[in-house]
């Protein structure tokens, strides 16, 4: 089933849900997946945008070179094979020849070719793609092009060697480069179609983009519904077992609604809320069918505004209070005291319940397994470096699904130091 990276992307930090699935539910239609969405897409321009609300739609419609399987392993998508030079600077991808572009109506438009990847990066660079920082200093010559040091895109290290071979030359070895190819800024786009749409490319209509993925967007109505239909011409269509996807907008105001629609057969999958009045009854009735959604690459976080100019939404009203607040925030020990003093698990439990509270937590901006450095993950390497901030940072666990920072004793010690300095 080729839906390993598609359809459900609710595992956000402080937003991981408990999901009720219709496995074995009587009269369930196995050819149609029905559920809800709560984040309204704002654009389908996958080359310029990187927000999860939008990419959760695009990932069902457009394929890149590689994708992640259900275990997070990188597997071929549009690239059927690839190689890396001995110095780690050149990545060469051989494209599958049966991948095509299709219109929203399912009509074949053109083959997917290597030049489509070159066009995609140039378009993103010319239009200040929001995820440009992911690749700007990675691809040779791209930074010079983006900053205006040169206007010659042929100096940039992305080349179509032939119709089905695309090559990237990097500024330095990046053992994790392949993982970057799953980001939409590195997805392909057909140049002829792009020019024909001009500023209409990626607007919120099905015909604003072309499709090379497992689904076609049948309909999108803002804060109402999203509908996909299986792309019958998709190169891997035999592995796509769900014919239709129907998502209804859910604003969270009526938490019992998802259960009612699940029980009526309207939803294949529904979110359940541990703090709702019906949760205990729902859990007892559907215990074997309740699962936790997985965390994904998206993180929600809050941080200090160290250069605050406005105090409109605080209790600080006098100039003295505002000055004291700013002075405290600029104190390193005060900030560390707050960091060690926030019980993130308790905070999460307010919306996710005690049972799911820790499952939502992340301790790094990106997943701790984001990249592999030798035999260690990004999280493990980062944790080993934290001791440079002081001995209190040693031994901190940056793995997902637990609070690596909360420590009452450390918070009190740091606060005491801050009081002396303030």
Residue ranges and their predicted role:
Residues 1-9:
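Bacterial Sec-dependent N-terminal signal peptides
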Residues 32, 37, 93-97, 164-174, ...:
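Short, hydrophobic/aromatic-enriched beta-strand segments in well-ordered soluble domains
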Residues 116, 123-193:
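Surface-exposed binding/hinge segments that line
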Residues 97-107, 111-127, 216-351, 372-422:
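Extracytoplasmic/periplasmic ligand-capture domains
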Residues 24-31:
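Bacterial lipoprotein signal-peptidase II cleavage site
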Residues 170-246, 257:
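Gly/Pro-rich hinge or "lid" segments in bacterial periplasmic/extracellular proteins
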Residues 36-86:
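N-terminal lobe/hinge region of extracytoplasmic solute-binding protein
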Residues 19-22:
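C-terminal motif of bacterial Sec signal peptides marking the signal peptidase cleavage site
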């Amino acid at each position: 089933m080729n839906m390993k990276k598609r359809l459900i992307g609710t595992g956000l930090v402080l937003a991981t849900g408990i999901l009720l699935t219709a496995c074995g539910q009587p009269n369930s239609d196995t050819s149609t997946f029905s559920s809800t969405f709560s984040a309204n897409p704002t654009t389908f321009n996958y080359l310029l945008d990187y927000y999860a609300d939008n990419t959760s739609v695009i990932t069902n419609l457009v394929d890149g070179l590689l994708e992640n399987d259900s275990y997070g392993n990188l597997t071929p998508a549009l690239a059927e094979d690839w190689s890396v030079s001995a110095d780690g600077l050149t990545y060469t991808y051989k494209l599958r020849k049966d991948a095509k572009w299709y219109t929203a109506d399912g009509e074949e438009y053109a083959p997917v070719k290597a030049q489509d990847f070159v066009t995609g990066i140039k378009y993103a660079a010319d239009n200040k793609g929001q995820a440009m920082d992911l690749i700007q200093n990675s691809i040779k010559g791209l930074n010079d092009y983006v900053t205006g040091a040169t206007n010659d895109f042929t100096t940039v290290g992305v080349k179509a060697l032939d119709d089905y071979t695309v090559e990237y030359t990097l500024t330095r070895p990046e053992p994790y480069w392949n993982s970057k190819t799953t980001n939409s800024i590195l997805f392909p786009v057909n140049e002829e179609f792009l020019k024909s749409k001009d500023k209409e490319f990626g607007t919120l209509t099905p015909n604003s983009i072309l499709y090379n993925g497992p689904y076609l967007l049948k309909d999108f109505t803002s804060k109402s519904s999203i509908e996909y239909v299986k792309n019958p011409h998709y190169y891997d269509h035999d592995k796509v077992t769900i014919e239709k996807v129907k998502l209804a907008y859910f604003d969270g105001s009526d938490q019992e609604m998802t259960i009612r629609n699940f029980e009526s057969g309207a939803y294949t999958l529904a979110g359940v809320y541990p703090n709702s009045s019906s949760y205990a009854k729902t859990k007892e009735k559907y215990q074997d069918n309740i699962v936790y959604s997985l965390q994904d690459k998206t993180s929600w976080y809050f941080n200090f505004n160290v250069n605050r100019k406005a105090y409109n939404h605080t209790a600080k009203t006098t100039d003295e209070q505002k000055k004291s607040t700013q002075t405290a925030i600029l104190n390193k020990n005060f900030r560390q005291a707050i960091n060690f003093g926030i019980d993130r698990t308790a905070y999460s439990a307010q919306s996710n319940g005690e049972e799911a509270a820790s499952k939502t937590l992340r301790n790094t901006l990106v997943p701790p397994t984001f990249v592999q450095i030798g035999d260690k993950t990004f999280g493990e390497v980062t944790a080993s470096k934290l001791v440079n901030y002081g001995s209190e940072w040693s031994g901190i666990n940056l793995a997902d699904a637990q609070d690596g920072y909360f420590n009452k004793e450390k918070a009190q010690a740091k606060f005491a130091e801050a009081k002396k300095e303030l």
